[in-house]
Amino acid sequence: MTDRAIKCRLPNSSDEPDVYFNDDYLYFGDVVNPPEASDRQADAIWKLLSLVQGSPVLELGCGYGRITNRLAKKGARLTGLDISPILLKKAKADAAESGVDVEYVLGDMRSLPWRDRFDAAFLWYLTFGYFGDADNERVLREAASSLRKGGRLLIDHVNSFAVPSHEAPICYVAQRNDDLRIDMVSTEVLTGRRHCDRLIVRNGCVRRTHLYYRLYGFAEYARMLRSAGFESVDAYGEEGAAFTSDGPRLVIVAHK
Protein backbone atom coordinates (compact mmCIF):
# COMPACT_ATOMS: atom_id res chain seq x y z
CA MET A 1 0.00 0.00 0.00
CA THR A 2 2.79 2.43 0.86
CA ASP A 3 4.50 2.25 -2.53
CA ARG A 4 1.28 2.91 -4.41
CA ALA A 5 0.23 5.71 -2.06
CA ILE A 6 3.45 7.61 -2.69
CA LYS A 7 2.71 7.65 -6.43
CA CYS A 8 -0.74 9.18 -6.00
CA ARG A 9 -1.37 12.88 -6.37
CA LEU A 10 -2.01 14.71 -3.08
CA PRO A 11 -4.82 17.26 -3.55
CA ASN A 12 -4.54 20.63 -1.90
CA SER A 13 -6.22 21.09 1.45
CA SER A 14 -9.65 22.66 1.38
CA ASP A 15 -11.74 24.58 3.86
CA GLU A 16 -14.99 23.89 1.98
CA PRO A 17 -17.44 21.65 3.87
CA ASP A 18 -18.77 20.07 0.67
CA VAL A 19 -15.24 18.86 -0.12
CA TYR A 20 -14.80 17.41 3.36
CA PHE A 21 -18.20 15.67 3.46
CA ASN A 22 -17.72 13.53 0.38
CA ASP A 23 -17.51 9.89 -0.69
CA ASP A 24 -14.68 9.23 1.77
CA TYR A 25 -16.87 10.53 4.59
CA LEU A 26 -19.59 8.15 3.46
CA TYR A 27 -17.20 5.21 3.09
CA PHE A 28 -16.05 5.39 6.72
CA GLY A 29 -19.50 6.32 8.05
CA ASP A 30 -20.49 3.01 9.66
CA VAL A 31 -17.03 2.65 11.20
CA VAL A 32 -17.22 6.02 12.93
CA ASN A 33 -20.93 5.66 13.75
CA PRO A 34 -21.92 1.97 13.90
CA PRO A 35 -25.61 1.17 13.30
CA GLU A 36 -26.25 0.40 16.97
CA ALA A 37 -24.86 3.82 17.94
CA SER A 38 -27.07 5.51 15.35
CA ASP A 39 -30.11 3.65 16.71
CA ARG A 40 -29.31 4.86 20.21
CA GLN A 41 -28.78 8.43 19.06
CA ALA A 42 -32.08 8.48 17.17
CA ASP A 43 -33.86 7.31 20.32
CA ALA A 44 -32.19 10.10 22.31
CA ILE A 45 -33.21 12.75 19.77
CA TRP A 46 -36.79 11.48 19.76
CA LYS A 47 -36.95 11.86 23.53
CA LEU A 48 -35.11 15.20 23.78
CA LEU A 49 -37.32 16.82 21.16
CA SER A 50 -40.53 15.27 22.58
CA LEU A 51 -41.44 13.90 19.17
CA VAL A 52 -44.64 12.01 18.40
CA GLN A 53 -45.76 10.13 15.32
CA GLY A 54 -46.55 12.58 12.56
CA SER A 55 -44.33 15.35 13.91
CA PRO A 56 -42.81 17.44 11.08
CA VAL A 57 -39.07 17.50 11.78
CA LEU A 58 -36.13 19.11 9.98
CA GLU A 59 -32.54 17.88 10.14
CA LEU A 60 -29.96 20.45 9.07
CA GLY A 61 -26.77 18.86 7.80
CA CYS A 62 -28.46 15.48 7.46
CA GLY A 63 -25.55 13.85 5.61
CA TYR A 64 -26.36 10.38 4.35
CA GLY A 65 -29.53 10.16 6.43
CA ARG A 66 -28.34 7.82 9.18
CA ILE A 67 -30.46 9.68 11.77
CA THR A 68 -33.09 11.15 9.44
CA ASN A 69 -34.21 7.78 8.11
CA ARG A 70 -34.29 6.25 11.58
CA LEU A 71 -36.59 8.98 12.88
CA ALA A 72 -38.80 8.50 9.82
CA LYS A 73 -39.05 4.79 10.67
CA LYS A 74 -40.28 5.79 14.12
CA GLY A 75 -43.15 7.70 12.53
CA ALA A 76 -42.07 11.34 12.30
CA ARG A 77 -42.35 13.27 9.02
CA LEU A 78 -38.76 14.10 8.16
CA THR A 79 -37.13 16.68 5.94
CA GLY A 80 -33.35 16.55 5.57
CA LEU A 81 -31.15 19.31 4.17
CA ASP A 82 -27.50 18.96 3.21
CA ILE A 83 -24.91 20.62 0.98
CA SER A 84 -23.50 17.35 -0.40
CA PRO A 85 -25.17 15.70 -3.43
CA ILE A 86 -23.14 12.53 -2.80
CA LEU A 87 -24.42 12.11 0.74
CA LEU A 88 -28.00 12.98 -0.21
CA LYS A 89 -27.98 10.35 -2.96
CA LYS A 90 -27.11 7.72 -0.36
CA ALA A 91 -29.74 9.09 2.04
CA LYS A 92 -32.45 8.84 -0.61
CA ALA A 93 -31.41 5.32 -1.61
CA ASP A 94 -31.47 4.11 2.00
CA ALA A 95 -34.86 5.74 2.57
CA ALA A 96 -36.29 3.99 -0.48
CA GLU A 97 -34.81 0.67 0.60
CA SER A 98 -36.29 1.08 4.09
CA GLY A 99 -39.69 2.07 2.71
CA VAL A 100 -39.81 5.47 4.43
CA ASP A 101 -40.88 8.75 2.86
CA VAL A 102 -38.33 11.50 3.55
CA GLU A 103 -38.02 14.84 1.80
CA TYR A 104 -34.34 15.39 1.03
CA VAL A 105 -33.26 18.85 -0.10
CA LEU A 106 -29.92 20.05 -1.46
CA GLY A 107 -29.24 23.44 0.10
CA ASP A 108 -27.42 25.76 2.48
CA MET A 109 -28.54 25.96 6.11
CA ARG A 110 -27.82 29.69 6.06
CA SER A 111 -30.76 30.23 3.72
CA LEU A 112 -33.79 28.00 4.33
CA PRO A 113 -36.95 27.99 2.18
CA TRP A 114 -39.34 27.13 5.04
CA ARG A 115 -41.22 29.37 7.45
CA ASP A 116 -43.29 28.20 10.44
CA ARG A 117 -43.38 24.64 9.11
CA PHE A 118 -41.71 22.31 11.63
CA ASP A 119 -42.37 21.20 15.19
CA ALA A 120 -38.68 20.49 15.70
CA ALA A 121 -35.29 20.82 14.03
CA PHE A 122 -31.88 19.50 14.91
CA LEU A 123 -28.18 19.62 14.03
CA TRP A 124 -26.55 16.41 15.16
CA TYR A 125 -22.94 15.32 15.48
CA LEU A 126 -20.83 18.37 14.67
CA THR A 127 -23.00 19.98 12.02
CA PHE A 128 -22.93 23.47 13.55
CA GLY A 129 -20.15 26.05 13.61
CA TYR A 130 -18.56 25.67 10.17
CA PHE A 131 -18.91 29.34 9.26
CA GLY A 132 -17.86 32.66 10.75
CA ASP A 133 -19.71 33.84 13.85
CA ALA A 134 -22.14 36.02 11.88
CA ASP A 135 -23.15 33.16 9.57
CA ASN A 136 -23.36 30.69 12.46
CA GLU A 137 -25.86 33.03 14.11
CA ARG A 138 -27.67 33.31 10.80
CA VAL A 139 -28.11 29.52 10.81
CA LEU A 140 -29.84 29.79 14.18
CA ARG A 141 -32.14 32.56 12.95
CA GLU A 142 -33.04 30.53 9.88
CA ALA A 143 -33.74 27.49 12.03
CA ALA A 144 -35.96 29.57 14.31
CA SER A 145 -37.89 30.92 11.32
CA SER A 146 -38.52 27.40 10.05
CA LEU A 147 -40.13 26.38 13.35
CA ARG A 148 -43.69 26.91 14.48
CA LYS A 149 -44.43 28.69 17.74
CA GLY A 150 -43.40 26.32 20.53
CA GLY A 151 -40.96 24.50 18.24
CA ARG A 152 -37.75 22.96 19.53
CA LEU A 153 -34.20 23.13 18.19
CA LEU A 154 -31.51 20.63 19.22
CA ILE A 155 -27.77 21.08 18.67
CA ASP A 156 -25.26 18.34 19.50
CA HIS A 157 -21.63 19.43 19.64
CA VAL A 158 -18.30 19.06 21.38
CA ASN A 159 -18.25 20.24 25.00
CA SER A 160 -15.74 23.10 24.88
CA PHE A 161 -14.99 22.72 28.60
CA ALA A 162 -13.66 19.22 27.98
CA VAL A 163 -11.38 20.14 25.06
CA PRO A 164 -7.71 19.85 26.10
CA SER A 165 -6.04 23.24 26.39
CA HIS A 166 -2.60 22.01 25.29
CA GLU A 167 -1.46 22.70 21.74
CA ALA A 168 -0.45 19.17 20.70
CA PRO A 169 -2.87 17.74 18.09
CA ILE A 170 -4.97 14.72 19.00
CA CYS A 171 -5.05 11.81 16.56
CA TYR A 172 -8.20 9.82 15.73
CA VAL A 173 -8.00 6.80 13.42
CA ALA A 174 -10.83 4.93 11.69
CA GLN A 175 -10.07 1.76 9.73
CA ARG A 176 -12.17 -0.12 7.19
CA ASN A 177 -10.45 -3.15 5.73
CA ASP A 178 -7.00 -1.86 4.70
CA ASP A 179 -8.17 1.74 4.34
CA LEU A 180 -7.57 4.44 6.93
CA ARG A 181 -9.03 7.79 7.92
CA ILE A 182 -6.63 9.70 10.14
CA ASP A 183 -7.75 12.95 11.79
CA MET A 184 -5.29 15.29 13.47
CA VAL A 185 -7.39 17.64 15.60
CA SER A 186 -6.07 20.79 17.24
CA THR A 187 -7.72 23.75 18.96
CA GLU A 188 -7.03 27.48 18.84
CA VAL A 189 -7.76 28.45 22.42
CA LEU A 190 -8.06 32.20 21.76
CA THR A 191 -10.43 31.92 18.77
CA GLY A 192 -12.38 28.82 19.77
CA ARG A 193 -11.66 27.19 16.42
CA ARG A 194 -11.05 23.46 16.23
CA HIS A 195 -9.08 22.34 13.19
CA CYS A 196 -9.18 18.90 11.59
CA ASP A 197 -6.46 17.85 9.16
CA ARG A 198 -7.76 14.66 7.59
CA LEU A 199 -5.63 12.09 5.79
CA ILE A 200 -7.44 9.43 3.77
CA VAL A 201 -5.53 6.31 2.71
CA ARG A 202 -7.89 4.38 0.47
CA ASN A 203 -7.39 2.02 -2.45
CA GLY A 204 -3.69 2.76 -2.36
CA CYS A 205 -4.11 6.52 -2.75
CA VAL A 206 -3.73 9.38 -0.29
CA ARG A 207 -6.02 12.41 -0.04
CA ARG A 208 -5.78 15.34 2.34
CA THR A 209 -8.49 17.74 3.45
CA HIS A 210 -8.73 20.40 6.11
CA LEU A 211 -11.72 21.86 7.90
CA TYR A 212 -12.38 23.84 11.03
CA TYR A 213 -15.41 24.52 13.15
CA ARG A 214 -16.18 26.92 15.95
CA LEU A 215 -16.57 25.74 19.53
CA TYR A 216 -19.14 27.57 21.65
CA GLY A 217 -19.85 27.33 25.35
CA PHE A 218 -23.33 27.18 26.84
CA ALA A 219 -23.44 30.91 27.64
CA GLU A 220 -22.62 31.74 24.01
CA TYR A 221 -25.28 29.35 22.73
CA ALA A 222 -27.85 30.83 25.09
CA ARG A 223 -27.09 34.37 23.95
CA MET A 224 -27.21 33.49 20.24
CA LEU A 225 -30.35 31.40 20.52
CA ARG A 226 -32.27 34.01 22.49
CA SER A 227 -31.19 36.61 19.95
CA ALA A 228 -32.50 34.30 17.21
CA GLY A 229 -35.94 34.18 18.82
CA PHE A 230 -35.87 31.26 21.25
CA GLU A 231 -37.35 31.76 24.70
CA SER A 232 -35.55 29.08 26.72
CA VAL A 233 -32.31 27.14 26.36
CA ASP A 234 -31.38 23.94 28.23
CA ALA A 235 -28.12 21.97 28.35
CA TYR A 236 -27.63 18.20 28.40
CA GLY A 237 -24.71 15.83 28.14
CA GLU A 238 -24.07 13.06 25.64
CA GLU A 239 -27.32 11.61 24.22
CA GLY A 240 -29.41 13.50 26.79
CA ALA A 241 -27.58 12.58 29.99
CA ALA A 242 -27.01 15.23 32.66
CA PHE A 243 -24.46 17.81 31.54
CA THR A 244 -21.07 17.75 33.24
CA SER A 245 -18.12 20.05 32.54
CA ASP A 246 -15.83 17.09 31.80
CA GLY A 247 -18.29 15.19 29.58
CA PRO A 248 -17.50 14.87 25.86
CA ARG A 249 -20.68 16.45 24.47
CA LEU A 250 -22.86 19.51 24.91
CA VAL A 251 -26.44 18.99 23.74
CA ILE A 252 -28.55 22.14 23.52
CA VAL A 253 -32.36 22.14 23.38
CA ALA A 254 -33.98 25.52 22.73
CA HIS A 255 -37.72 26.29 22.75
CA LYS A 256 -39.26 28.96 20.53
Outline where the language-model segments fall.
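Class I SAM-dependent methyltransferase SAM/SAH-binding core
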Residues: 66-111
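SAM-dependent methyltransferase
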Residues: 134, 154-224
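A short glycine-rich, Lys/Arg-flanked "PGG" loop and its adjoining helix->strand segment in the class I
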Residues: 137-149
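C-terminal lobe and adjacent flexible extensions of AdoMet/dcAdoMet transferase-like proteins
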Residues: 218-256
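A conserved beta-strand element that flanks and buttresses the S-adenosyl-L-methionine
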Residues: 122-124
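Conserved class I S-adenosyl-L-methionine
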Residues: 2-63
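A short acidic, Gly/Pro-enriched loop at the edge of an enzyme's catalytic core
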Residues: 110-120
